[in-house]
Amino acid sequence: LSAAVIILYGLFFAPPSPDPKQVNNNDQNKNNLQLNEAPKIEQNIENNKISRSEAINKVERILFENENIKGSISLEGSLIDDLIFKKYTKTLDSDENVVLLNPKESENGYYIETGWAINNKDIEVPNSNTKWEVIGNKLLTPNTPIKLVWNNEQNITFEKEISIDDKFLFTVNQKITNNTQNTYNFYPYGQIIRNLAPDVTDFYILHEGLLGVFDDNLVEEDYDDIKDKKYSVNANKGWMGITDKYWITSLIPESNKSFRSDFDYKNKFKANFIETDATEVRANESKTNQVKVIIAAKE
């Protein structure tokens, strides 16, 4: 699997040689008091342990489907948290399709979150409980992306356009429009959260757990290892994810953007990244960011 994903990343997502970094513009609004360091990603979500079907029906959703996968995206948090493999069954003699992703409130919660963080506590940013509004199309297919919008009380607009290909790739294009007279620094992030570890095969040539490639270096951490010790790394390119015997869920940050990635366990497993260079959004300005999500079978 690791080799396959490395090849996939190299073919489709490896960034070109980076341009010289722009000199930081220090002429920021003096009223904007905030740190210039990427904040920690903290989403403390309690496990309510309701059934999967209850959790799915509890919130509004956008359905998605292509030749290989189907499921839904929760409008509470814009979480990719319901995914079924259409071509794989739980056993050879079963008609029941494999379910990989589950809502956060179910016992076996397993989901993907993308968004923006900020060091300024006076500015609201979307979180896992934010109620997003759908604009236009309400069915996500390879031919029909969806658009989600949320406005905070400070008059800053957050948008997401989510698309899928005909296999296992989601592309999340995020946009911030600053309708205020101040300048703010935002930090794009993405994280995969899993409440419980799966039954592990414990076969020595097969890695199951958290993994990633950071500046061409492969990192593999078992579920038990992460319970004992957090792993952190800074990188200029790469990807990170969580893998089982047959399946993988992974995130690919935007090309040419430096980031910090953490593998952590605090009552649930997390593989995440946050860009370490702030996205400066000035008054009446818009900025964008892209995160790619691969949720795939190990074919």
Where are the predicted features?
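Juxtamembrane extramembrane loops of integral membrane proteins
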Residues: 2, 11-92, 97-100
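Soluble non-transmembrane domains of integral membrane proteins
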Residues: 61, 65-299
